[in-house]
Amino acid sequence: LVAIGTNWDDIAANVGATIVAQVLTLKQAALDDYFYGPWQIYIPSNYETILDQDYDATTPGTTIRERIMKIAGINGIKVIDHLPDDNVLFVQMSKDVVRLVRGLGLQNVQWKEEGNMVTKYKVLTIQVPQIRSDMNSRSGIVHLS
């Protein structure tokens, strides 16, 4: 857990430099725990438009998102609608950190109703993420709040 002190949507001046500095702090925390990337950043929906603001006045047309994506090892930034406001997850995208467990592959289910006059379909699957950690309880996920 890395505490940020100021939320990204509360920063008035120098917002771009502050956010990039905090992302670099997340990266260093991951490196200190021996997780070397590649990483994915997950943000709440209240940060989505903030990352589309200009990085600074000297580089108009360059957004904060574009500046973050220039940091080595960061593969992408995704919005998680259900992530609480002012929380950021920095996740190493490897099978030793997180993997997808498939309980049931993609299936089509078909049935008939109303005297075989109406055919209905549903598609279902069972998939859950499994968060993993090493024997020292390090998980490769850095939480910024």
Each predicted region: which residue ranges?
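Long, contiguous amphipathic alpha-helices that act as assembly "spine/axial" helices in icosahedral shell
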Residues: 1-7, 30-43, 114-128
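Alpha-helical scaffold segments that mediate packing/assembly in large oligomeric complexes
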Residues: 1-25
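Intrinsic disorder/low-complexity detector
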Residues: 9-12, 40, 89
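Hydrophobic alpha-helical segments and helix-packing faces
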Residues: 16-19, 34, 61
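Short secondary-structure capping micro-motifs at structural edges
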Residues: 20-31, 64
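Surface-exposed polar/charged interaction patches
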Residues: 29, 33, 71-74
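Structural motif
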Residues: 43-47, 93
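Sequence/fold signature of self-assembling virion shell proteins
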Residues: 52-145
